[in-house]
């Protein structure tokens, strides 16, 4: 059975902006109020996808939902057509309105937690849609994300789809950004590491233990394969609002900051006892602040056809000499990571999302991949058409003040229908 990992990247939507909605996200706060460049943002994301395609990897795409959201306003008692209620909401409650316009669905790592068929009791790939309950602008994505996942992975012989957990911070779940799978190979049984946050006095911990436990139950993870590890409080306090800001794993390799987890040494020892050939790469020569600013650990590690691995990094790693030296030490070290690919995702980075944030990892057998809706799998031809579509329909530049302009809403609708046509 041939099993590979397919990355599904979120296409960045036409209302991409810097409204500073995400408490605990250092980059979001730093760039709040600045102009954004939605067209450039989406093209940067597409170029990253093309890099992986050119490396011989299968690449999928998630399409952005229509923004601004209007259904919530109807639930809140607004009356009239979409244009009328959006105008009124923008006048009444600007913060609420800004939440309705967010393009944060681009960060597909928060779409769901994915459980491999080799780790689930029923032998299917399980998708547990994240409720994203901590932040309103993220929570508004949950139901449309579930619908899109259900469309792409509709074959119940191979896939099991789960609704988001009940809303409320008791069950706050932010998806694969707080989940790592460590295994000797994608096609073998592995440990599912669920990283959760404990109470923090500075920033909210977005992943609750009881949520992670529920996700493991829903995904039918075999009990001995579900491990629950607390994220280090200092990491959250320094701006690591998801585990994937301080750690990333691929097959039997773990790349992590030395202060990523509580009792880290003990957990590393336990993983080594469970997984043959486990290689931990623990970085202790840069600070948590450097890790958060550079997003070194928000990289993608991918397995290439020759069984070596590549590190897909944001270009910001080159801005800090100590971080860039660390990258070079990694790829020259005694581990399978032999290639560093630097990509430009500056527009996403300015809102707190690096290469790893932009993708959802889905391990698929050859048969399961064939059962996926192929319209969401990119080929060179479909990628080119999507690239041209973005160039034609995405606005070049917007500011947070532009979000209230009806012309921008019309632009977003036109882009949405163009994507619908592209999908076919």
UniProtKB/Swiss-Prot annotation:
Pathway the protein acts in: Amino-acid degradation; L-arginine degradation via AST pathway; L-glutamate and succinate from L-arginine: step 2/5
Single annotated GO MF: N-succinylarginine dihydrolase activity
Coiled coil: none
Binding site residues for substrate: 19-28, 110, 137-138, 206, 244, 351
Job description of the protein: Catalyzes the hydrolysis of N(2)-succinylarginine into N(2)-succinylornithine, ammonia and CO(2).
Family, similarity comment: Belongs to the succinylarginine dihydrolase family.
EC number(s) on file: 3.5.3.23
SUPFAM superfamilies noted in UniProt: Pentein
Transmembrane residue ranges: none
InterPro entries xref list: AstB_sf, SuccinylArg_d-Hdrlase_AstB
Catalytic activity annotation: N(2)-succinyl-L-arginine + 2 H2O + 2 H(+) = N(2)-succinyl-L-ornithine + 2 NH4(+) + CO2
Organism, as annotated: Zymomonas mobilis subsp. mobilis (strain ATCC 31821 / ZM4 / CP4)
HAMAP family: AstB
Entry protein name: N-succinylarginine dihydrolase
Keyword annotations of the record: Arginine metabolism, Hydrolase
Subunit: Homodimer.
Catalytic residues as annotated in Swiss-Prot or TrEMBL: 174, 242, 357
Top-level taxon: Bacteria
Biological processes, Gene Ontology terms: arginine catabolic process to glutamate; arginine catabolic process to succinate
